[in-house]
A protein has these predicted regions:
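Soluble extracytoplasmic regions of secretory-pathway and membrane proteins
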Residues: 1-457
Length: 457
């Protein structure tokens, strides 16, 4: 897959070129994006000026906006109004508009939904999906309250949080649709009665879009910060806070940083089925070792199901910060980093990922090389893989994993050899005579063949 490309290879694109084309069976009938994540200024479309044409034919006519988003500005009064509103006289004096022209504004999707529904809180991580025709932004909306009875406040601001709605924003037209994700949430039900028609049932979302829904990362992070204390169900242990957790720690540069939850595809819950999961590695509070993994299901059928995998408390499992230290002190990796980290270039280590696999923990970290000039285009150079005390760096994941397994097998062979007692060679017979039996102890005492046993020998 493109996600498993080799180091030093050029980046592999899922979609590329204009018009977009794909080597991975991705199709998109309308690739235009008028609403996105940046702080876009207003836009007037369609107009008498051609827009960028998505056609591969260089002689093809330019394209024009054909959506229903925005506000028509065919009259002088509206042009004057928006010219004053945006403090831009070009809106009033331009001669490039026509009777079909519309002004598009609030084109940042977060600003758009916050303006429409200021009583909802939104996830900071909108993501784009496709139904093979248009592009859509999906956002998670929350209802909150600081007044929920008998609930501990979080961060001093709220003690009630529900992922009440999934919000869909059409990237072409800007149309916003709210789908009720939690029908049992009393706050969203109250808003539904206040604003009839605001929320649609989740079943009304297109199936090809509903398959892209995922468990919200911000919600899961809040849940894990609370669960870090309340996973202790024994009263004495909870009272003494003997097993309080925190997010596993790593380093970014010289600064310690948490490994917050991230999305992965694993067969962790069912060995016969790969699933899209949200994973959080957890460590004991104040320690660098790994204590457990918590995963939330994102696929249909397991959506929202949270599972915890504990490591035995007496077993030491290296945490990400300890693996970071092993990487730093590996002489072969250090030599490579020193060679690359010369004038004009800099090494940047990517996010360290924790993967449970085959009954053990595997760490993976990409290594990028980037320019120190103004224009920085990071290039994937190497992949670091680690298991136990061993760290390996190679150009791709498969080669690195194979080398790592070889070193682990060599380590196991050395341990097996150390456990076996050294055999004492028997003297060769002279002229066909039988070897002489060792003297000092009769046969049957456990010292046959000259093998020494006993604390004084």
């Amino acid at each position: 897959t493109p996600a498993a490309q080799d180091g030093e290879d050029p980046i592999t694109w899922f979609l590329r070129d204009i018009p977009p084309r794909s080597d991975y069976a991705l199709t998109l009938a309308n690739p235009a994006i008028y609403f996105g994540l940046k702080d876009y200024d207003y836009a007037i479309a369609p107009s008498d000026i051609d827009e960028l044409s998505p056609s591969a034919d260089p002689d093809a006519a330019g394209s024009h906006y054909q959506g229903a988003g925005g506000v028509p500005i065919s009259s002088l009064f509206r042009k004057l109004f928006y010219s004053i509103y945006f403090q831009d006289s070009d809106i009033f004096f331009t001669r490039n508009t026509n009777s079909a022209s519309r002004i598009l504004y609030r084109r940042n999707v977060l600003e758009r939904v916050r303006t429409l529904t200021p009583f909802l809180i939104f996830d900071e991580d909108p993501y784009v999906v496709s139904d093979q025709t248009n592009l859509y932004w999906i956002l998670d909306a929350y209802t909150t309250s600081p007044w929920y009875p008998n609930a501990e406040p979080f961060d001093g601001r709220l003690n009630y949080l529900r992922n009440a709605a999934k919000v869909l924003v059409n990237a072409y037209t800007g149309q916003v649709t709210y789908y009720l994700a939690d029908p049992n949430d009393p706050i969203s039900n109250a808003y539904r009665r206040i604003y009839p028609g605001l929320f649609q049932p989740l079943s009304a979302m297109k199936p090809e879009l509903r398959r892209h829904l995922r468990y919200p990362r911000d919600l899961f992070e809040v849940q894990m910060r609370i669960y870090a204390r309340y996973h202790q169900t024994e009263p004495d242990r909870f009272f003494n806070q003997e097993d309080t957790w925190q997010f596993a720690q790593t380093y970014r540069g010289d600064q310690a940083a948490e490994i917050t939850p991230y999305y992965v595809t694993l067969n962790l819950l069912d060995p016969a089925r790969y699933e899209f999961l949200l994973l959080a590695p957890m460590s004991p509070k104040g320690l660098d070792t790994l204590r457990g993994l918590v995963v939330a299901g994102c696929d249909e059928g397991r959506y929202g199901r949270i599972s915890t995998f504990y490591f035995p408390k007496g077993t030491q499992v290296y945490g990400p910060s300890q693996i970071h230290a092993l990487i730093d002190q590996d002489t072969r990796i250090s030599q490579e980093f020193t060679l690359w980290d010369q004038v004009g270039s800099a090494i940047e280590r990517g996010r360290m990922l924790v993967f449970p696999t085959a009954g053990t923990i595997l760490y993976i970290q990409p290594v990028y090389l980037k320019s120190t000039t103004r224009l920085k285009i990071p290039e994937l150079k190497r992949i670091i893989v680690s298991q136990g005390d061993y760290v390996v760096m190679d150009t791709n994941l498969e080669a690195g994993f194979a080398t790592l397994q070889e070193r682990l097998q060599q380590h196991r062979n050395r341990l097996e050899g150390a456990r076996q007692p050294a055999a004492i060679e028997q003297p060769e017979p002279v002229n066909g005579a039988a070897p002489e039996r060792p003297r000092g102890k009769p046969a049957g005492t456990g010292l046959e063949g000259g093998a020494a046993a006993g604390p004084n020998q």
